[in-house]
A protein has these predicted regions:
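N-terminal low-structure segments adjacent to metalloprotease catalytic domains
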Residues: 1-57
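Metalloprotease/metallohydrolase-associated module, dominated by Zn2+-dependent proteases
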Residues: 1-5, 9, 161, 179-244
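Active-site His/Glu-centered metal-binding helix of metallohydrolases
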Residues: 13, 146, 150-154, 167, ...
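Active-site metal-coordination segments of metallo-dependent hydrolases
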Residues: 75-89, 216-238, 275-282
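Active-site-proximal gating segments in proteases and membrane effectors
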Residues: 98-124, 188-197, 222, 233-299
């Protein structure tokens, strides 16, 4: 409920901010309001930004669990399938209790070494691990991986990342169109009011939306990498030591992490051996260094 309230408050704040920024820009350039530059479509634009940018991202999150299961072929387990499954469910239950959240659904999916968490609410999440990671890791390493995913759940990272993406989507939609309208109608001599420059306007919208979208993606990736450090630290705290998480990361460094669908990449345990500004995860070496610097005294 707290996250939903935050989502609604953020939506209102974003729309107000966009209105203020757009009006200041038009006042500075033309000495008039954004409604005079863009026309009556301004209100429609704000509604479109809200529905497509904000609600679209949140609706995707609401359906994230069934989408994740279908995209990865994940099968929910209850611990009655065998000894390995029983241990997996019991471990997730224990970590959930320590993290102060309800036990999420537990699933296994076929594929290379990886794991992920998803779900719109921390008390109704899904944690899934691949068959390969179960076979390649020791129980202590796998427990650390599960602790990492449970930290994502407890921290509400799925909602927070969706909120960031939604806010940026709305900014890209509105700012690209405001700038396109300003540039397309520059020097028309009528206070910036839009005239028959439709072709130029739509060309500018496409270019600006692409450029601003790339910038927005970089911000989302940066934020995702920060949340990975927090999830690693959360795993270390749940287990009482960073050593198991360090061992799990080293193990992953010797494997080829499985590729997850784009919608799940940010919530996986690893993305690949290399990292860049486009990566959802820091490099394994940087994550290990951060855990080593965490220090036993902080634990």
């Amino acid at each position: 409920m707290k996250r939903i309230f935050l989502f609604l408050v953020t939506n209102i704040a974003v729309l107000l901010t966009l209105g203020i920024v757009a009006n200041l820009l038009c006042a500075f350039l033309y000495g008039t309001s954004v409604e005079q530059v863009i026309g009556p479509e301004w209100t429609v634009l704000l509604v479109y930004a809200f529905v497509y940018g904000m609600l679209g991202a949140f609706i995707s999150l609401l359906f994230s669990k069934p989408i994740a299961k279908m995209s990865c072929g994940a099968k929910t387990i209850d611990g009655t399938e065998g000894e390995a499954e029983r241990w997996l469910v019991a471990t997730v239950e224990d970590l959930a209790r320590q993290a102060g959240v309800k036990t999420p659904e537990v699933a296994i999916y076929p594929g290379a070494a990886n794991a992920f968490a998803t779900g719109a609410f921390k008390n109704s999440a899904l944690v899934a691990v691949s068959t390969d990671i179960m076979g390649q890791m020791t129980k202590e390493e796998l427990r650390a991986v599960l602790g990492h995913e449970m930290s994502h759940v407890a921290n509400g990272d799925m909602v927070t990342l969706t909120l960031v993406q939604g806010v940026l989507n709305a900014f890209v939609i509105v700012i690209s169109r405001v700038l396109a309208s300003v540039l397309a109608n520059a020097g028309n001599g009528e206070g910036g009011r839009r005239r028959n420059n439709g072709g130029l306007y739509f060309l500018l919208v496409m270019v600006l939306q692409l450029a601003l979208g790339i910038l927005a993606s970089l911000i989302v990736m940066w934020f995702s990498r920060k949340r990975e450090y927090a999830a690693d630290a959360g795993s270390a705290k749940l287990l009482g030591t960073p050593s198991a998480m360090i061992a799990a990361l080293r193990r992953l460094g010797n494997l080829q992490p499985g590729v997850l669908p784009d919608s799940l990449r940010a919530m996986g345990i690893a993305e690949g051996k290399k990292t860049s500004i486009w990566s959802t995860h820091p490099s394994i070496e940087d994550r290990i260094e951060a855990l080593q610097n965490l220090g036993a005294g902080i634990m």
